[in-house]
Amino acid sequence: MLKCPETKTVWIYTDCQIKEDVSDIFDLIEEGKLYMVEDKPWTQRRGEVWHNSGVVGFVGKPPILYQWVKAVKENPTVGDQETLHSILNPITKIGNIADLPNRYNVMRLQVEHDSYKGPVSIMHWTGRKGKDRIRNML
């Protein structure tokens, strides 16, 4: 993410399926924060707000991006999403993360377990079962 030469960036994991034109996402992101979708399944199961790192929008290189990269390099044994969550508390999260609408990163668990019926612009095929679904689409 740090090496991306563009001013406005939307980072999308390779296990995400773009289901329609998502270019309007660039109209939602502004300087100074990471723009992410709340990870509704993790928030529900863990009892605190989590954001999913499958789709991350930002303008320029906000300071939190450097902190996140540094923390991932220092502790490569856990996932990047867990690392970001660990370096933020509820107050610093407000200053560093802004919510994107859910449709830009709908988790597999939302559809398969939580009866999500809303719009899906980007489907995130998480976990082993998600990777199996991707293989079946190829």
Residue map of PLM features:
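Alpha-helix initiation/capping motif
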Residues: 3, 51, 101-102
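Short, charged, surface-exposed secondary-structure boundary motifs
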Residues: 43-51, 131-135
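Short, solvent-exposed loop/turn segments at the edges of secondary structure
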Residues: 50-53, 118
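GT-A fold catalytic core of metal-dependent nucleotide-sugar glycosyltransferases
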Residues: 1-48, 57-58
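Catalytic core and acceptor-binding pocket of nucleotide-sugar-dependent glycosyltransferases
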Residues: 59-138
